[in-house]
Structures are given as structure tokens and as C-alpha cells.
Amino acid sequence: MVAWKDLERAEPEFAARARRLFDAGRHKTIATLRADGSPRISGIECEFAGGELTFGSMPGARKGADLRRDPRFALHGPAFHPQEGKEAEWPGEAKIAGRAVLAGPAGEEPAGDLFLADISEVVITRLNPEATLLVIESWTPPRGLRVVERE
């Protein structure tokens, strides 16, 4: 299992930027797979604690049922759009993909499921300093960090 602390050890600066982007707002978006294989998008909150990325699901929530059946997920941090004329100041956005590992009941009421993220990829999308190129930074455990620029 690849925990958040593994990314922090491998790429501390990249991990810190990704976490700042996730911590910039309370509400995130998670994509899960329905029983028929079609995608489901749901709002969610997550927490970075003890070197782990965790998130929960309330009792009876469809996203929790999705994750118990098929643990694959994609998590998108809060979205903030670049301001016109100030595009170079946009911090970007972060995404995390992986598998949700059921860790037991959530510690808060209402009781639900607590999941740990087994991370397969972390991506930061931003603009270059001149705001002329899209910069995609992605990290995977086997490959490490890669940076691609696009017009």
C-alpha cells in the first residue's frame, strides 16, 4: 500500500504543494464506480493525518457502497478558477487516484466507513510563470515525478 507519507518521502515539495491545494477548501469531489460500471461523482471531505490520506462515507451512502464493491477512486481537490488578467497567480489544482482501503468505522457521528487511500497517482495541474503553458506534474510510485508542458 502506498500512503501519503510515501509521497512525502519521495517528493516532499510536490507533496506539500498538492496538500496545500487540497487544504485550500473543505469540499472535494470523488469519482467512484457504480455496480454497472458507470461513474458516480460525489462531494466528500478528506483529511491528511499521521502520514495517511483518509476519507469517510456516511451510513447508507452510495459512494461507500461503490468503494466497498470496487475500491478504485479519483479525488479532485477544491477547484478555483484563474482570474482574468491574473492567470499566473493561479495555484493550480490537485487530483489523487488510487484504491480505497476500508479501515473500519468512522470515528465521528453519524457512524460510517473510514477509508485509507492506497495512492496510485497524484497530479498537479497549473500554469507556467508566464501563464502561456499548461504544466502537468504527475507522480506514480513506480515512475516517480514527471512534468509535461502543453500549449
Protein language model features and the residues they cover:
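Well-ordered beta-strand positions in beta-sheet-rich domains
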Residues: 41-43, 93-97, 136
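Short beta-strand segments
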Residues: 25-59, 75-77
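Short, structured beta-strand-loop surface elements
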Residues: 4-5, 59-122, 128-130
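Extreme N-terminal tail/first-helix region
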Residues: 1-24
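Flexible glycine-rich active-site/ligand-binding loops centered on an Asp-His dyad
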Residues: 115-120, 129-151
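Short alpha-helical segments used as structural interaction elements across diverse proteins
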Residues: 14-16, 23-25, 37, 60, ...
